[in-house]
């Protein structure tokens, strides 16, 4: 991913189909995120949302070096291994990959999933202390922003979450 040594990597993805509301919420934090020296965002938008995210962000070349926008990540294992923090939906495959690589995460379950199974999935990591859960309805509010900035500001907390994920 061409991430500079020592950078803090925020990985954002919505699963194989992407997640428009999640993309909107992360894009709304552009100025706040890019104001953090050493932060690199790797943002997998889903194919349907790539143009929307690129247009919404309107990144300069300098900003684009720190905010990598792509429709899909073919080597998710490599991306998760590089990530200091993950923001993701909570589909079964996403949870399995996040857990396998012990990546600290903020999980935003898709609210219309059958029988709310993504919330159930998320609790696997949340209950272990390896993730935070932010309901989709709270993406536009202070809880998502404060959860994200709080974890970016606390490397010790992320390290504890990583250890919790390892069991």
Describe the role of every protein-language-model region:
Residues 104, 130-131:
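Residue-level detector of anion-binding/catalytic polar loops
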Residues 157-167:
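A short, well-ordered alpha-helix in the C-terminal region of glycosyltransferases
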Residues 3-88, 119-123, 127, 134-144:
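Donor-nucleotide binding loops and adjacent catalytic segments primarily
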Residues 148:
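Hydrophobic "lid"/C-terminal helical patch
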């Amino acid at each position: 991913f061409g991430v500079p040594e020592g950078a803090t990597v925020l990985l954002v993805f919505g699963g194989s189909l992407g997640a428009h509301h999640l993309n909107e919420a992360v894009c709304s934090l552009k100025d706040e995120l890019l104001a953090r020296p050493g932060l690199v965002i790797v943002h997998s938008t889903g194919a349907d949302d790539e143009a929307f995210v690129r247009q919404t962000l309107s990144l300069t070349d300098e900003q684009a070096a720190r905010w990598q926008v792509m429709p899909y990540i073919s080597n998710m294992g490599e991306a998760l291994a590089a990530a200091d923090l993950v923001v993701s939906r909570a589909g079964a495959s996403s949870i399995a990959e996040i857990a396998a690589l012990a990546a600290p995460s903020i999980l935003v379950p898709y609210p219309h999933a059958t029988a709310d199974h993504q919330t159930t999935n998320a609790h696997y990591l949340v209950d272990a202390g390896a993730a935070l859960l932010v309901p989709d309805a709270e993406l536009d509010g202070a809880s998502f922003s404060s959860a994200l900035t709080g974890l970016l500001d606390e490397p010790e907390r992320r390290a504890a979450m990583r250890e919790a994920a390892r069991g």
